[in-house]
C-alpha cells in the first residue's frame, strides 16, 4: 500500500496528514475552515486518494498559515507515499468544467517542483476564505509533492466554481498520474532511470 503520514508542528499550526494513494476517496478533513475542508473533500473524492487532515491553526489571525501548512504537509505525504515512483503514469491532464467555468490542469509527477497558476477570481472572498489562498495552497502542495503543476482557468465568473474546478481538476489529473501502469510495472518513467532532478 502506498501510504504516508506527515506531522508538522510550528508556532502557528499543528497538522497531521495521512494519505493512501490506493484508497477509495475517503476524506476526513478537519481544519476549522469550512470552505477549505470542502475543497479537501473534493480532492479526496475525485482523486480516489484517502485523505485525513487534522489541523489546529492560528485562525484568529487569518486562514493563511493553516491553508499553506496543510498544502505543505499534504504535498510531503503524497511524495513520501509515492516512494521511487516506479510504475506510475507520471503525466496527466484534465479539463474540468464547473457550470460556466472551465479549468485546465496538467501535472508531471517528476520530482521537479514547479507551479504555473492562472486563475482570476471575481471576488476577494468565498464566504470567509480569501481567494488568494487558493494559489497559496497549490504552491505549497506542488513544491512539497515535487510535481510540476500547471493550473489555468480558461474562463469563469463564479469564484466558488473557479476554486472548485481547480481542486477537482487537480484531483482527476493526480489520480491518473499516480496510477500504476501495468505495462511499466516496476519501471521508473524516465530515461534517466530516476525521477527528481
UniProtKB/Swiss-Prot annotation:
GO cellular component: cytoplasm
One GO process term, biological-process aspect: L-histidine biosynthetic process
Family matches, as CDD domains: IGPD
Record's catalysed reaction(s): D-erythro-1-(imidazol-4-yl)glycerol 3-phosphate = 3-(imidazol-4-yl)-2-oxopropyl phosphate + H2O
Alphabetical UniProt keywords: Amino-acid biosynthesis, Cytoplasm, Histidine biosynthesis, Lyase
Subcellular location: Cytoplasm
Pathway assigned to this chain's UniProt record: Amino-acid biosynthesis; L-histidine biosynthesis; L-histidine from 5-phospho-alpha-D-ribose 1-diphosphate: step 6/9
Gene3D superfamilies assigned: Imidazole glycerol phosphate dehydratase, domain 1
Example of a GO MF term: imidazoleglycerol-phosphate dehydratase activity
EC number of this enzyme: 4.2.1.19
Family: Belongs to the imidazoleglycerol-phosphate dehydratase family.
Name of the featured protein: Imidazoleglycerol-phosphate dehydratase
UniProt organism field: Rhodopseudomonas palustris (strain BisB5)
Amino acid at each position: 500500500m502506498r501510504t504516508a503520514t506527515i506531522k508538522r508542528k510550528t508556532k502557528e499550526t499543528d497538522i497531521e496528514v495521512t494519505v493512501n494513494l490506493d484508497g477509495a476517496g475517503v476524506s476526513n478533513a478537519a481544519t476549522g475552515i469550512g470552505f477549505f475542508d470542502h475543497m479537501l473533500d473534493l480532492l479526496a473524492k475525485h482523486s480516489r486518494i484517502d485523505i485525513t487532515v487534522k489541523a489546529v491553526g492560528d485562525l484568529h489571525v487569518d486562514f493563511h498559515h493553516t491553508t499553506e501548512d496543510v498544502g505543505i504537509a499534504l504535498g510531503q505525504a503524497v511524495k513520501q507515499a509515492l516512494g521511487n515512483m516506479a510504475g506510475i503514469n507520471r503525466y496527466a491532464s484534465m479539463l474540468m468544467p464547473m457550470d460556466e467555468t472551465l479549468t485546465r490542469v496538467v501535472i508531471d509527477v517528476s520530482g521537479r517542483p514547479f507551479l504555473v497558476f492562472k486563475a482570476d477570481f471575481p471576488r476577494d472572498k468565498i464566504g470567509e476564505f480569501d481567494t488568494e489562498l487558493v494559489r497559496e495552497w497549490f504552491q505549497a502542495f506542488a513544491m512539497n509533492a515535487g510535481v510540476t503543476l500547471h493550473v489555468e482557468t480558461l474562463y469563469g465568473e463564479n469564484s466558488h466554481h473557479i476554486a472548485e474546478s481547480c481542486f477537482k481538476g487537480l484531483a482527476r489529473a493526480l489520480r491518473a498520474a499516480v496510477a500504476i501502469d501495468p505495462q511499466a510495472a516496476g519501471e521508473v518513467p524516465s530515461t534517466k532511470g530516476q525521477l527528481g532532478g
